[in-house]
């Protein structure tokens, strides 16, 4: 069972008080993940600690639960009951903003020279939230308040293609994880981990990437 050192916890005041009374060691075991939420450019998880009641649940950033992979995977399974839990990506499969260019494998070098090729926008997929909605220069706290909607009521839906109105942007959090900022058809603004977005609304993600690609013809001399 993964354990987390006391000094790594972002909210540990209540746990420390309980620890003083019971003489527990300076490590806590993750029993399960209850829910998640967007926090700026990152995802936080509401964690239930083994041996502690719900009153001691704390919100922890992704890096604080990195050692609790099984608990996090089990949580994502509850968010998508029809799919298996996301498997751990290998080094070669690590997904970064710089790898989001869509480049078809050419059938031959001559054919490739005649085809258009794609490249991401100057700033890549990481872009500011749509300036048309008044977010130019918005702080992380401002974005938190805007994109604070809950995904709980959508968790039982197999597909979110019909409930996601639009993907506004995809940004890379401090831990390296890509996060989708979306507006639902009900008007609420939410943050979605990319692995969940790729399962629930893959076409919406594809349309977003296509919209932010720039096409340019290849020089015949290249």
UniProtKB/Swiss-Prot annotation:
Annotated localization: Nucleus
Stretches with biased composition (Acidic residues): 16-26
InterPro entries: Chromo-like_dom_sf, Chromo/chromo_shadow_dom, Chromo_dom_subgr, Chromo_domain, Chromo_shadow_dom, Chromodomain_CS, Heterochromatin_chromo-domain
UniProtKB keywords: Nucleus
A Gene Ontology BP annotation from the UniProt entry: regulation of biosynthetic process
Composition bias type Basic and acidic residues, residue spans: 1-15
Pfam families associated with the record: Chromo (PF00385), Chromo_shadow (PF01393)
Keyword Nucleus: yes
Disordered, as annotated region: 1-26, 77-147
Domain Chromo: 28-87
Subunit structure: Interacts with DMT5.
Purpose: Recognizes and binds histone H3 tails methylated at 'Lys-9', leading to epigenetic repression. Localizes DMT5 to heterochromatin characterized by trimethylation of histone H3 tails at 'Lys-9'.
Name of the protein: Chromatin-associated protein SWI6
